[in-house]
Amino acid sequence: MNFLFCSVGRRGELIKNFKKSLNEDSKIIATDCNNTAPALYFADKQYIVPKITDDNYLSTIIDICKKEEIKAITTFIDPEIEILAKNRKLFEGIGVEVLAPYAETASLCFDKFKMYEYLVDKGVKTVKTYGDFESFRIDYENEACTLPVFVKPRTGSGSVGARKIDNYEELKGICYNERDLIIQEFMDGNDLDVDVYI
C-alpha cells in the first residue's frame, strides 16, 4: 500500500515514524514545492510540485497518485487539508482515500474565528477571541478585556504572523494595516501542540 504525504516541509521525524509502522511492501511518497524541504528525503520517493495555490497543483497530485498507485493521501500543512477535503470524490474516483476531515470540518478548523464561535456555541470553555478591532475596542473601553493580547491571522498556520501585543496604539495600527486578524486574550504558560493521526 503506497501513501502520499503532501507538503512535508521539515517534518522528517514524522515520515520516519510512519515508515516504522508500515509493512515492508508499503511505500511513502512525499511532495513539497521546495526541493530543499528536508522531509522529502526521508520518503521512499520524492516529487517537487507546484505551490498549493497554483492552478496545476491538483492535477499534478492526481497524476502522482495514478503513477505511484497511491492508496491514501494526507498533508502536513493546514491550508492543504481543505483542498484535499473538497476534492475527496475526485481522489476516491481513482481509488485514493483522503486522510483528512470532511470539507465542512476542515473549513471550520482552518478559520480560527469560526472555530471560536463554534466552541462558544457548544459550551466549550475557550480563550476570548475577537474577529475585528472594533469588537475588541468596545470591550477594552468597557474594561471587559485588557492588554496584552495575542494577534494572529484568522486562517494562518505554522504560527506565521502570530505575536503578542502590549500596546493599544500598536494593536490598532496592526489591525488597520493587516486584514483578517483575530485578537485573543493573552494566555501565559507553556505552549503545547498536538498532532493526532488515527
Name every feature range the model reports, one short phrase each.
Residues 39-41, 57-59, 107-111, 159-162:
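Short, charged, surface-exposed secondary-structure boundary motifs
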Residues 46-52, 128-134, 163-166:
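Short acidic-hydrophobic, aromatic-tinged amphipathic segments that line or gate anion-handling sites
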Residues 64-70, 143-146, 177-178:
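Glycine-rich phosphate-binding loop signature in dinucleotide/nucleotide-binding domains
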Residues 1-99:
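ATP-binding N-terminal substructure of ATP-dependent carboxylate-amine bond-forming enzymes
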Residues 163-198:
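Phosphate-binding site of ATP-dependent enzymes
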Residues 104-129, 134, 138-144:
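Glycine-/Pro-rich loop/turn segments that contact NAD(P) or position catalytic residues
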Residues 119, 142-160, 179-189:
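ATP-grasp fold ATP-binding core
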Residues 37-43, 138-144, 173-177:
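Short loop/helix-cap segments at secondary-structure boundaries that form the rim of catalytic
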